[in-house]
């Protein structure tokens, strides 16, 4: 299986070009074709010699993804189901925000973090995505926008789709450098947010990368007992270890950290827990922000439901009274398979049902012949 050329940073592409006996400027030409002209084949790179096009076609593909399903919400949110070269499925979401167009990308096929409320973890991690497969999600969404001829551009990225981004660290870092490159897509680093469930050592490493992207931490509980019961990762990196890493990140980068907090009815949404959360973040109040997230129910996790508006507002009020910077996050795509991983999970179910039906039909046909 040929890798995608999107897997290369510009520096990597220059290295490959030189190693293959070509002039350095060819890398710049290829880069501009990929990210400025956004061509989908090497044959469209009309200022390259035929011999170089043949080399590229021999070693790489451009976009490795196939579009399987597109769902569009009434609010303009678009969810894509893409098929990878090995047949695995991933999701990508385009959201219309007041500040621009934001894309949520997936970094792994499945997830091993084991959050008990999440659709992403219904299927264990199969593999990491390559950097090229992550970049390709942005490129296909941008292609979709280009074809609408409304002069729309992906302006923001959230690395919050299926999987744990910091568990696929090297590929995610390459992805960030590709989309941030000012000679390519030129998406500003401060318009990019990487989320983590709390891999403390990787947070420390990320702090020292020198990138200006934003960090979000999926917290979802204010104490170890509760967090360990709903997020398996907390048993490995408990809250005190996680917060030591977060404080180190803030000290090194002087950048704000966002905490994601899904509101689960009568699980983590009490006013006592709001006070615990306020106390937990007290030492980093000036450089932290809390997103309260309405829960998108998942049929396989029917023990959970969305917090009521009353409980959410009471929780929010406690945080505000403690001087916490917080907001109740705007919802997107509530009339489609909104929860992360839900479209993929539902599609896999339907595919299995169709396969069983085909097998049953074949058996019935064989029985008739017999």
Swiss-Prot record:
Binding site for S-adenosyl-L-methionine: 163-164, 195, 218-220, 296
Disulfide bonds: 104-340
GO process annotations (BP): rRNA base methylation; tRNA methylation
Cofactors required: [4Fe-4S] cluster
Domain named Radical SAM core: residues: 97-329
Catalytic activity: adenosine(2503) in 23S rRNA + 2 reduced [2Fe-2S]-[ferredoxin] + 2 S-adenosyl-L-methionine = 2-methyladenosine(2503) in 23S rRNA + 5'-deoxyadenosine + L-methionine + 2 oxidized [2Fe-2S]-[ferredoxin] + S-adenosyl-L-homocysteine; adenosine(37) in tRNA + 2 reduced [2Fe-2S]-[ferredoxin] + 2 S-adenosyl-L-methionine = 2-methyladenosine(37) in tRNA + 5'-deoxyadenosine + L-methionine + 2 oxidized [2Fe-2S]-[ferredoxin] + S-adenosyl-L-homocysteine
Biological role stated in the UniProt entry: Specifically methylates position 2 of adenine 2503 in 23S rRNA and position 2 of adenine 37 in tRNAs.
Protein name: Probable dual-specificity RNA methyltransferase RlmN
Species annotation: Streptococcus suis (strain 98HAH33)
Lineage, uppermost ranks: Bacteria, Bacillati, Bacillota, Bacilli, Lactobacillales
